[in-house]
């Protein structure tokens, strides 16, 4: 629940200057509450980094530099794919932080910050795709990936963790978007989502007529990076709502043509 509200608060903080004082107070109060009681998962800390970076771009005027924004766009879109290839080839696994971070960081609420909880998800997703011959096309959202991890829990008596049962191997979905999309839609689906994020991020950054929309374009590129470790898309998520809201905005020629003052007026009317 905290994470759901946090994403909306961090989204609205980008437009807080255009809001009336009462709406500003509401956003700040929610942020304070979440900061005190809601920091219970590592992804929450990661989620906080994104709006801070975007706010810096907004307040310092860096977002006005279209060339810099395009460099960030292309780097952010290709970096996780490069790291993904390095990981599956065994050359470098960025998720195994203990291998290159000498001292493990421990949070009272989130536990060990360097613990790798994602590598085995990719191992299960890829091995299931290869073994069942659906690596290219996927096996549709009606199925999950074959999971020896869930099998071990079922063998120990924890029944009901699997999404479905096909044969003897339990299947499941996971808390990261990319392993799920590989399972459901294969490499083809992965490429489609890559192009979706690439197209709309590029469109917003290069075709919009105001800075706030350009920042939303940068938001989508960072969301693409985050989809490799979270954003499962298996339930209603504030993060996905914001992404599709951004896509809808970029699909509106009228909104894309608004200058900074006109867009600020639109936000003020929308939050009245």
Give the predicted meaning of each segment.
Residues 1-105, 167-271:
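Hydrophobic transmembrane helix bundles of membrane-integrated enzymes that assemble
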Residues 109-185:
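Long extracytoplasmic/lumenal interhelical loops at the membrane interface
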């Amino acid at each position: 629940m905290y994470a759901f509200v946090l994403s909306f608060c961090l989204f609205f903080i980008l437009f807080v200057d255009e809001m009336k004082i009462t709406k500003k107070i509401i956003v700040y109060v929610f942020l304070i509450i979440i900061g005190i009681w809601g920091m219970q998962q590592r992804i929450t800390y990661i989620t906080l980094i994104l709006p801070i970076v975007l706010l810096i771009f907004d307040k310092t005027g860096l977002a006005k530099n279209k060339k810099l924004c395009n460099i960030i766009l292309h780097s952010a879109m290709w970096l996780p794919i490069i790291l993904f290839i390095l990981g599956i080839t065994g050359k470098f696994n960025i998720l195994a932080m203990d291998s290159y971070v000498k001292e493990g960081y421990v949070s009272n609420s989130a536990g060990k910050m360097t613990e790798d909880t994602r590598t085995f998800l990719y191992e299960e997703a890829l091995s299931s795709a290869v073994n069942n011959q659906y690596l290219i096309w996927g096996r549709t959202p009606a199925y999950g990936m074959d999971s020896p991890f869930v099998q071990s829990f079922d063998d120990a008596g924890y029944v009901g963790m699997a999404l479905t049962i096909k044969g003897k191997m339990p299947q499941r979905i996971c808390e990261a978007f990319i392993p799920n999309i590989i399972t459901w839609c294969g490499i083809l689906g992965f490429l489609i989502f890559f192009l979706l994020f690439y197209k709309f991020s590029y469109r917003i950054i290069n075709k919009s007529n105001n800075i706030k929309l350009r920042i939303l374009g940068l938001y989508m590129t960072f969301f693409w990076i985050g989809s490799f470790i979270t954003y499962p898309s298996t339930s209603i998520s504030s993060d996905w709502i914001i992404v599709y809201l951004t896509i809808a905005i970029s699909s509106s020629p009228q909104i894309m043509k608004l200058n900074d003052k006109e867009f600020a007026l639109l936000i003020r009317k929308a939050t009245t």
